[in-house]
Curated annotation (Swiss-Prot):
The gene is ycf21. Its main location: plastid. Belongs to the ycf21 family. Pfam families: Rv2949c-like. This is Uncharacterized protein ycf21. Keywords: Chloroplast, Plastid. InterPro entries: Chorismate_lyase_/UTRA_dom_sf, Rv2949c-like. The lineage of its organism: Eukaryota, Rhodophyta, Bangiophyceae, Bangiales, Bangiaceae. It is found in: Plastid, Chloroplast.
Amino acid sequence: MTFNFVSCWNTKRILPNQIYRNGSIPIIWKVILLGDGSFTRHSEILTYAITSVDHLNTFIYSNEQILLKSFINRKVWIGTNTCKKLIFASSWWNIKGYEKLYKYPSQAIGSFFIQSELDFYRDIHEIFLGYSFELEKLFSSKGPFWGRHYTLFYKGKPISIIYEIFSPLLENFQ
């Protein structure tokens, strides 16, 4: 899935204190974009509903000669019974790491790590805000759309790069 995206704001140097103090970013987005916990857990708190994952696809890009260059791309929608599309997420994994750690592709990544009691952390690389006609159609909602991308670490090693785009409807749950 590719989107034409017109960016109206982004930051690639994530200094949480600068974002916390930025009065132009609504509090709800600060919590969602910079939260240290699982978005799945945050969305359940915000919406008072259990989240579900709509697994779109998992695609394997492989190079049999160089297994370390082989990777998996997983795309999902995360939502609730009343709002099926709260977030679009695309994650990129090294095949070995994916097969070793993540055994339930129908489960949200954050939920899996929390239930497994695995210690992980994320390093946010970019937060962005913008408009996209394709996203407006997919989310059935007018923009702008907030998003982020980050690296997920386990035992100090990078295991996944994750891109997330959030529905503007999340602002309605404040």
